[in-house]
C-alpha cells in the first residue's frame, strides 16, 4: 500500500471553509501547551465551517496514561477538537476497570462517554460480558495507534536474556517452581484484552501454555514499576512508557516489542457509547475529524519533542520528557544488553504505517481480538464461535463513520480504505491470519482452549 498523501489544501479549504489548511500536517506552532487537562486549549486552530451546527458541544473521554492516548490529549491541547466546535474533556482513568465502570455510567451519570479502549472491550460491553450483564452498546470509530507496547522482564532474569523467541528459555520457565519455589509470574493490565493477548501469544509461540505453565496476574500499568521492583512479578505486558521506564530505572529490560511480534498491529481504539453517537451524528464526525488531524500531527517527526513535553505534564502521564521523547523517536532499548533499535517506525505510529492506514478501524483487524478470545475460551456466552464473533464485530465496528469523516475532512480518496482488511497478517512465529478465513488461523494454533 502506498504511503498516505497530505490532505490537499484546495480540497480542505473547499470542504471545511477553514482559513488555513496547514494545521493538518505541519509542525506544531505557538507556545508549548500547559500540562493541564482542563481549561481552554493552548493552541487555537482556525474554526471549521459547520462547527457551530453540532447537536452538542461537549464530550468526556477517558484515557489511560500510555502512548495510545496521545491523539486524544493532543487533539485537545493543540486545539484540533475545538476547531470543529467540540470541547473535549480528557479524563485520566485509574485503571481499565475504572474506565469500564465510568462508561457504564455515561457522562450524564458522572462517568464518561467513551474514549481509549483495549480490544475487544467495546464489543464485550455491548453484550454485557464485562459489565455484570448490563449491556452498554458501543461503537468502535478509529484505531488510535500501532505498536508502542512491550514485554518487560525483571533484571533478576537478566542472565537468561529472555527475548522475542522464548523456545530457548522454555525449560527455564517450566522448571521455575523447582528453582524458585513458585510458578513464573507474568502480568497484564486488564484480562481478556490487548495486553493479555500479547503476552499469551508470546508465551504460546515459545511452547509455554500461559494457563498451565505460568501464573498470570492483572496489574494496572502505573503499578507495574513497583511490582517488578519488589519481585511480585517476573515480567509484564503493557503500553509504553512503562516498559521503557523499567529499563531506564534499571529494574528490568524489554524482552520484546509487540511491533516485533506483529509488525504494525492494531493497538487500542477510540470507542463511544452507541447512544451518544446515534444522538449526535454531527458531533461524532467533528470528533473524528479532530482526531484525524491530531493523529497526523502526532506522526510528524518534527512534532515528537513537543508531543513528549505535552504528554509529560502532571495531569497527563506525569513522566519525565527524558523517558518519553526517546521512545517517540524510536530510540528503544531491547534485550538484556539494552541494544538501541534507533528506528522511528519501531515506536508508536498514529496515522500511517508501511501497511497503510493506522487510524482506519478495519473490521478484519478488530475481528482478530474476538477470534483470539475464542482461542483462549474467553466469554463463551457471547463468543461461542467464529460466526457469532463476526456478527458482533460487524455491529460494533463503524468503518462507515470513519470514511464519512475522512471525506468531509478532505482526505484524498486514495488514502481512504475501501476494504475491511489489509490482507494477510504475519506474526513473528510464522503464523498467518487472514481475516477472510479466521477459522483457518484458529486451527493453525497449537496452544489454545478452542
From Swiss-Prot:
Acetylation found in the keyword field: no
CDD domains xref list: PBP2_NrtA_CpmA_like
GO CC, one annotated term: plasma membrane
UniProt signal peptide: 1-36
Domain of life from the UniProt record: Bacteria
Listed GO MF terms: bicarbonate transmembrane transporter activity
Disulphide bond pairs: none
InterPro entries per record: NrtA/CpmA_ABC-bd_dom, TAT_signal
Membrane topology note: Peripheral membrane protein
Record's keyword terms, sorted: Cell inner membrane, Cell membrane, Ion transport, Membrane, Signal, Transport
Subcellular location: Cell inner membrane
Induction: By carbon dioxide-limited conditions, probably via CmpR. Also induced by growth under high light intensities. Repressed by iron-deficient conditions.
GO biological process: monoatomic ion transport
Chief localization: membrane
Post-translational modification: Predicted to be exported by the Tat system. The position of the signal peptide cleavage has not been experimentally proven.
Pfam families tied to this protein: NMT1_2
Family per similarity comment: Belongs to the CmpA/NrtA family.
Self-association state and partner proteins as the record states: The complex is composed of two ATP-binding proteins (CmpC and CmpD), a transmembrane protein (CmpB) and a solute-binding protein (CmpA).
Job description of the protein: Part of the ABC transporter complex CmpABCD involved in bicarbonate transport. Binds bicarbonate with high affinity.
Protein name (database record): Bicarbonate-binding protein CmpA
The organism of origin for this protein: Synechococcus elongatus (strain ATCC 33912 / PCC 7942 / FACHB-805)
Organism lineage: Bacteria, Bacillati, Cyanobacteriota, Cyanophyceae, Synechococcales
Amino acid at each position: 500500500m502506498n504511503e498516505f498523501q497530505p490532505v490537499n489544501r484546495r480540497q480542505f479549504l473547499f470542504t471545511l471553509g477553514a482559513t488555513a489548511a496547514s494545521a493538518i500536517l505541519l509542525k506544531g506552532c505557538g507556545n508549548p501547551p500547559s500540562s493541564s487537562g482542563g481549561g481552554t486549549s493552548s493552541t487555537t486552530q482556525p474554526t471549521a465551517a459547520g462547527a457551530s451546527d453540532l447537536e452538542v458541544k461537549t464530550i468526556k473521554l477517558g484515557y489511560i496514561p500510555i502512548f495510545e492516548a496521545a491523539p486524544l490529549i493532543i487533539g485537545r491541547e493543540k486545539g484540533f477538537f475545538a476547531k470543529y466546535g467540540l470541547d473535549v474533556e480528557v479524563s485520566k482513568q485509574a485503571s481499565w476497570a475504572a474506565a469500564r465502570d465510568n462508561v457504564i455510567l455515561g457522562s450524564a451519570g458522572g462517568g464518561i462517554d467513551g474514549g481509549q479502549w483495549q480490544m475487544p472491550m467495546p464489543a464485550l460491553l455491548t453484550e454485557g460480558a464485562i459489565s455484570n450483564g448490563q449491556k452498554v452498546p458501543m461503537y468502535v470509530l478509529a484505531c488510535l495507534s500501532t505498536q508502542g507496547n512491550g514485554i518487560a522482564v525483571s533484571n533478576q532474569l537478566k542472565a537468561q536474556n529472555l527475548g522475542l523467541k522464548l523456545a530457548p528459555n522454555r525449560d527455564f520457565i517450566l522448571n521455575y517452581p523447582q528453582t524458585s519455589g513458585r510458578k513464573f509470574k507474568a502480568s497484564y493490565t486488564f484480562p481478556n484484552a490487548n495486553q493479555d493477548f500479547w503476552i499469551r501469544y508470546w508465551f504460546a509461540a515459545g511452547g509455554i501454555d500461559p494457563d498451565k505453565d505460568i501464573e498470570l496476574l492483572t496489574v494496572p500499568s502505573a503499578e507495574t514499576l513497583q511490582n517488578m521492583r519488589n519481585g511480585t512479578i517476573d515480567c509484564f505486558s503493557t503500553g509504553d512508557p512503562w516498559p521503557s521506564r523499567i529499563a531506564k530505572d534499571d529494574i528490568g529490560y524489554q524482552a520484546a516489542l509487540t511491533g516485533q511480534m506483529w509488525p504494525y498491529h492494531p493497538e487500542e481504539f477510540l470507542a463511544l457509547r452507541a447512544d451518544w453517537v446515534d444522538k449526535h451524528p454531527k458531533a461524532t464526525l467533528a470528533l473524528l475529524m479532530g482526531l484525524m488531524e491530531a493523529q497526523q500531527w502526532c506522526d510528524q517527526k518534527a512534532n515528537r519533542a513537543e508531543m513528549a513535553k505535552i504528554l509529560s505534564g502532571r495531569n497527563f502521564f506525569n513522566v519525565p520528557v527524558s523517558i518519553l521523547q526517546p521512545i517517540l523517536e524510536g530510540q528503544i532499548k531491547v534485550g538484556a544488553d539494552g541494544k538501541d533499535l534507533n528506528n522511528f517506525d519501531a515506536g508508536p505510529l498514529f496515522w500511517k504505517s508501511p501497511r497503510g492506514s493506522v487510524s482506519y478501524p478495519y473490521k478484519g483487524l478488530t475481528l482478530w481480538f474476538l477470534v483470539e478470545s475464542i482461542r483462549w475460551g474467553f466469554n463463551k456466552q457471547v463468543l461461542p464461535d467464529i460466526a457469532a464473533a463476526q456478527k458482533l464485530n460487524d455491529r460494533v465496528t463503524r468503518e462507515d463513520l470513519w470514511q464519512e469523516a475522512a471525506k468531509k475532512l478532505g482526505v484524498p480518496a486514495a488514502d481512504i480504505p475501501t476494504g475491511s482488511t489489509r490482507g494477510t497478517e504475519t506474526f513473528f512465529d510464522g503464523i498467518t491470519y487472514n481475516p477472510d478465513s479466521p477459522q483457518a488461523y484458529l486451527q493453525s494454533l497449537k496452544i489454545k482452549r478452542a
